[in-house]
């Protein structure tokens, strides 16, 4: 597939490396320019391009950008064909993104992103730490393979996203409509807890919007309690412990 990744940070860089390594034709763009794309992001064959070129003639576009800024790309996406699959990886943290009243009033995070962008999106890759994504992807069929939820309103676009999740080394789970994607947002039981395909459905079902938002908003204090240099394993355990 011809894929563009917009955003060359930890998540975007991981996806560019893994998807190009899996044989896809991958381009990477960053709002700061091509020079902002680190050489290691391109080490498996991805190419750095200008942002204006990132959405041209693509089968899929992955948004690996901060939550709440998708509206800045609305003009860029205005001419993108409807059949191009657009995937959103972002997460809403008020202490990082600023308080967004629409979300606080109940608009689901990726529904908000879709509205800003002016087109449908599929939610994927948001519910795993960047380090989990970088180091723990394994071939299909491997016992204990970590699962990633995928939510969206089109069965076909979800199938595309789920195939790409599999290509990055994780089992994909159909988590329902985009309106249900709040269940995989911070800090629900399914968020960054490294669950298998058998474990993930129950975690999504156990999500509680009020409780999970309260846990999310306490994250600065929770991280501080982990000390100066927490490991990814420490973070996963912290997330799991929040729901025991």
Mark where each language-model region is.
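Rossmann-like adenosine-cofactor binding region
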Residues: 68-79, 92-99, 104-106, 223-227, ...
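NAD(P)+-binding Rossmann beta1-loop-alpha1 motif at the extreme N-terminus of oxidoreductases
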Residues: 1-44
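Active-site-lining helix/loop region of Rossmann-like oxidoreductase modules
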Residues: 143-244
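General beta-strand structural signal in soluble alpha/beta enzymes
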Residues: 48, 120-125, 173-175
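Rossmann-like NAD(P)-binding element
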Residues: 45-85, 91-96
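Rossmann-fold NAD(P)-binding glycine/threonine-rich loop
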Residues: 82, 90-131, 135-139
């Amino acid at each position: 597939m011809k894929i563009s990744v917009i955003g060359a940070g930890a998540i975007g860089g991981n996806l560019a490396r893994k998807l190009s390594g899996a044989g896809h034709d991958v381009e990477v763009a960053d709002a700061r320019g091509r020079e902002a794309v680190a050489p290691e992001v391109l080490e498996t064959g991805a190419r750095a391009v200008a942002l204006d070129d990132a959405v041209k003639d693509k089968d899929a576009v992955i948004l690996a950008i901060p939550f709440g800024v998708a509206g800045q790309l609305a003009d860029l996406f205005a001419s993108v064909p409807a059949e191009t699959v657009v995937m959103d990886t972002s997460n809403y943290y008020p202490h990082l993104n600023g308080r967004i009243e629409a979300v606080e009033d109940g608009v689901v995070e990726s529904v908000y992103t879709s509205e800003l962008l002016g087109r449908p999106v599929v939610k994927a890759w948001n519910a795993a730490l960047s380090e989990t994504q970088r180091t723990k992807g394994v071939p299909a069929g491997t016992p204990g393979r970590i699962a990633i939820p995928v939510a969206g309103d089109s069965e076909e676009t979800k199938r595309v996203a789920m195939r790409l999740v599999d290509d990055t080394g994780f089992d994909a789970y159909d988590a329902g409509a985009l309106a249900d994607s709040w269940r995989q947002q911070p800090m629900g039981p399914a968020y960054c807890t490294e669950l298998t395909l058998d474990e993930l459905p129950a975690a999504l079902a156990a999500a509680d919007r009020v409780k999970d938002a309260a846990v999310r908003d306490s994250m600065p204090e929770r991280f501080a309690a982990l000390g100066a240099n927490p490991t990814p394993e420490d973070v996963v355990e912290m997330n799991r412990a929040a729901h025991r």
